[in-house]
């Protein structure tokens, strides 16, 4: 006989199957859980606990969702001895498809008039769930290279691309991923506002074919907007490969909209999709249908829509082998294992830094030799004088000192691309949530932190994925303590000079110091400014995917172009300005650049003025000036040293000149790297903080981090002197 009992979802052990009976809690969390699939009569399976036993991974509607135990406690479930049926076969009340109240959109005439007004331009809004392949499709269609990744929250604002197709100019707007059009998050509000006010000609709804039931919830809401909808059934190859099948033509007929199967990562189906958009634009009739949910509250409407979707899929969808469904998550048996999860994460991080230094050192040496050779060659062509000094000591020494670290930065971005594209980024957040919540940080904050290893600006912007303002602000203010790639040239330079035997470990140590002070800052902010409770940890764990070589190479190429552009603009300008400030004023007839001249130059006088502040940290005036110029961009620290130390002997490498600085010891060098790590973010990052959090927090970040950098570096130097 079947045994049944009602229990809290949080109380179930791993491997238990159950059926949702009720969702409790406040309205916002109830709605979010329902949108993710936790609706009445929906089967759920408890997959596993995180290594620290919280959060917990659940399978619902062919997706894997991470919930903290206090969130899972809000869900009442029915446990049976039998494995629940497929959700497509579990419907609490059998209904006929025709019983759903579908009607023609009252705004059809208005939409058609707006459509005809801009005959040669089609405005298309790209809408879909997070991580459904929107941005990949956007890149293939437009030829642009926006960031893609296998985790939710990659797109944080609207991206626009325009291209020509069949005589039309198609303006494609990639909107942030959203589970619905309610107002549970900033992304949902943004998407709803855009669709309501900008009125695109066509909504291109990207539906993840491998998780179609949940994705169609958004589709039913888009049908209510009064705008023609075209559905791209993306990742169609994954659906087929696991033995599932769907009659997408019948699906389109029942929804009164065109459905086109696609594979955005390779471009499959995109030409047909664009042709369908043009056909919709040229069509004289637009039969826009939607569900009549009048008289229902938001939660009732969500449940009603899922009933409609279940009945719809019963007509067109056939599920294959469930073992193939689980195949995409098999790696979790090891990567998020109770015993192996943390060690594997730490090993990966160490490997990233070790490879960045070890592998990158070979091309770095080649570029360094080429730069020195080129500088000597140009110097031999030019006559002694101001112009020669500008080119050799200013431009080549300054820009060349930064150029040599390009291979290391590309290797770092290679590892970050692998983290993002495989889906491991979300697993890292899953593993770290319990630990991070103890120090006042949200588990999702780990994603901006890892992005921050590349650049603080997109990392700060990605904090928008956090729904709670407190979590968002704390994350934004702690992200700059992650060592971005702009700081990497400084670390690599000093590590190679003073820590040759332990390069990988010292580099990892610097990154860990940044994480440590991010934690300390979070604790301070939570104690002083933010005393509220963090938002719930609701995170989708995407299936593992093998990164495409194309996406990884594009990611690395784009970063190299950005780096080279920065060298051709900010770093070049800074190098020339620093050279001019060190070159002038000059006495009559004195055209030689010597250490004595630099002492009395404009920059020398400025450096000596701030030297009393820097001396307690063990830094002379040249190091102090380099730190100040690093506010423009952290790479400028290296180019500044390249200019300031290139005085009399052009044949000696920058590393040798740094090693020869009086009193500059390994612990002083470590303190200098920590100062670069902790001091005020660059101008671009401060602007991002101001835009995302406000002027007050941008000023706080600059002042607090600079004071912290001085105190910590001073302690390292003074304690080091006592011990060594």
Feature locations, PLM:
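Short, membrane-interfacial amphipathic segments enriched in basic
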Residues: 314-328, 380-388, 539-554, 595-599, ...
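Conserved C-terminal guanine-recognition region of P-loop GTPase G domains, centered on the G4
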Residues: 163-166, 190-259, 490
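Hydrophobic core segments of alpha-helical transmembrane domains in multi-pass membrane transport
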Residues: 344-354, 412-417, 495-497, 511-524, ...
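Canonical P-loop GTPase G-domain recognition
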Residues: 239-287
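Transmembrane helix-loop junctions at the membrane interface of multipass transporters and ion channels
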Residues: 481, 485-508, 684-694, 713-724
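Conserved G1/Walker A P-loop phosphate-binding module
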Residues: 101-180
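Juxtamembrane inter-helical linkers in multi-pass membrane proteins
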Residues: 369, 373-377, 381, 426-456, ...
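Extended, low-charge hydrophobic alpha-helical regions
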Residues: 361-395, 399, 439, 460-474, ...
